[in-house]
């Protein structure tokens, strides 16, 4: 099943009602996220569960649910990749080395036996 976002209008009078609603909905299989807006009296459920099952679960605790919308959840905006500064490889300069060779020739008697 696909993930759905379900918005349900439910009367939320007190903290006890809020707690009972949260407990009842989170017991369902396939529920990923549950949020309650107490000022607007809206329950938002995200998951793979059936909206009818959510409404029935709320009826079991004597609430009168009104389904506002059922649809796919909003996908988060993709964050733009931060631009990376280009990495410059330093150029290694070639420094020629001077090579000095010294050849010494002995001039002399030519006798190698000492």
From Swiss-Prot:
Q: Which Pfam families match?
A: HMA
Q: Which GO molecular function terms does the record list? A: metal ion binding
Q: Which residues carry this modification: Cysteine methyl ester?
A: 111
The residues covered by the HMA domain are 3-69
Record keywords, A-Z? Lipoprotein, Metal-binding, Methylation, Prenylation
Covalent lipid attachment of type S-farnesyl cysteine occurs at 111
Tell me the Gene3D superfamilies matching this sequence.
Answer: 3.30.70.100
Propeptide positions, renumbered to this chain? 112-114
Binding of a metal cation occurs at 14, 17
InterPro entries for the chain: HIPP, HMA_dom, HMA_dom_sf
> What protein family is recorded?
Belongs to the HIPP family.
Please describe what this protein does.
Heavy-metal-binding protein.
Indicate what this protein is called per its UniProt record: Heavy metal-associated isoprenylated plant protein 2
Q: Source species, please?
A: Arabidopsis thaliana (Mouse-ear cress)
Upper lineage is: Eukaryota, Viridiplantae, Streptophyta, Embryophyta, Tracheophyta
């Amino acid at each position: 099943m696909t993930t759905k976002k379900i918005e349900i209008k439910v009367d939320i009078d007190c903290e006890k009602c809020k707690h009972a609603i949260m407990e009842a909905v989170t017991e369902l299989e396939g529920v990923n996220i549950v949020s309650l807006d107490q000022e607007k009296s809206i329950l938002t459920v995200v998951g793979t569960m059936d909206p009818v099952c959510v409404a029935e679960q709320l009826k079991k605790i004597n609430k009168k649910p009104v389904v506002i919308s059922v649809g796919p959840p909003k996908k988060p905006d993709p964050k733009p990749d931060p631009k990376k500064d280009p990495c410059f490889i330093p150029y290694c300069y070639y420094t020629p080395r001077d090579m000095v060779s010294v050849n010494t020739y002995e001039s002399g008697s030519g006798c190698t036996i000492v």
